[in-house]
Amino acid sequence: ASDVYKRQVQMNPYDEKNSEPNFWLSCMLIDKDAMCQQVRGEQKALYISEPGKSCPTEILETLAKYNAEGRPIWKPMHEQPIFRMNPFITREGNGRAKTNAYIEGGSEDVGMDIFERGLCLPSDNKMTAEEQDQIIEIIKSCFM
């Protein structure tokens, strides 16, 4: 397994001095090089399990075996069926224009990248440290 995933799950930094977060919703994003192959459709998802790698679908299925409820990250609005053909804005302008052969580079669809690599973890502001550690261990086991 990758040495990266032998470490604990890391939190995003926040201003401890000037904020009082409640951590009611915890999400994670899998590094691109640690993702196994995954395809998500409207209703189903498929993946190919690989040693040292995982994906949101595999992690969610594994958590469910332990009666721990997670869910996929919310699908970006511009990918919802009702809005799929509408324009959306990126740093580079209209995200729908990225297939134009005359535009160099194209735009990065950050929302879809987060959707493909992210998931919402079992979350509750009353979770104990022991429960959190159990979730972390389950997630780490997916990368073995």
Regions picked out by a protein language model, each given a short descriptive name:
Residues 2-144:
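PLP-dependent aminotransferase class I/II
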